[in-house]
Amino acid sequence: MLKRFVRYSLFLALGLLVLGCQSTKPMMYASKKITGLKTPESVVQAKDGRIFISEINAFGQDGDGRISVVDQHGNVSIFADNLDDPKGLAIIGEYLYVADKTKILKINPNGQVSVFVSAEAFPHVPFFLNDLEADLQGNLYVSDSGDLFNTGKGGAIYKITPNGEVKLLIKDTQDTRVIAPNGLLADDTGNHLIYVDFSSGVLYSLNTSTSTLSDLADGFGGGDGVVHHSSGVMYVSDWKNGKVYSVNMMGDLSLVKGGYQAAADIAITKDERYLLVPDMKAGELDFIALDGVKP
């Protein structure tokens, strides 16, 4: 259950954020599942309706990662390639930002890639940069899931200013609940950051000023992505168990859809009609209709 002393204010702030971002642009392609992707991890939609998908391809194989784009008719093409292990995506203005292993990339509208934040710009060289989130002030937030495959240590969350300065918000040595931070969701003020932990499956709220954590909900297995609907409903994906859950304003968890091989970093379309779910192991992008969503 959501902790009621933080739930109301956080959902109110998130509701204001999403209401300001809605679009009525029709989704001509939305019923068409995208197949044939190479280890899709994250997805984000631009204001013009295009959908960008990060494709890792082979983990640890540098240079074989790419970003694909789906146009308004459902046609898929390569937007940028020769990446390493691209994961989280965020859009600020006309630029696409990508969390790629230990660095943050910036891609212009023509698909030209540059390094926005190098590994050396972080207080500590990251282990496994994962999700990426932007706030309304133009800041980026990135999760470092830590040394997932060995020690299980090193989890952290960072804030990146518009000019590329990096600030540590929280790390595992500050709070033992920080294990493998993954999916991120910022409110409209930048004062709170909701995130789900991949190892514990717990959903948290992080106060970005005080670096204090509040438990919101649990039971998400291998928590991967988290998004918010203007009705007040949040959606969380469980990578390990191939499921997507909803959490309503009362704190009730419901299974939205299961059967995925690995439900990765989800997104909501600008018109809020569909939930976008990359199935990493299946190589697909699924569209879940959100008709009749209630708070």
PLM region spans:
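Beta-rich, blade/repeat-based domains predominating
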Residues: 36-48, 54, 63-64, 80-101, ...
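Beta-propeller domains
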Residues: 55-72
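A short beta-strand motif characteristic of beta-propeller blades
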Residues: 28-34, 74-80, 113-123, 165-176, ...
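Bacterial N-terminal signal peptides that target proteins for export
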Residues: 1-10
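Short loop/turn segments that connect beta-strands within beta-propeller blades
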Residues: 70-74, 107-112, 160-165, 207-211, ...
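C-terminal motif of bacterial Sec signal peptides marking the signal peptidase cleavage site
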Residues: 18-20
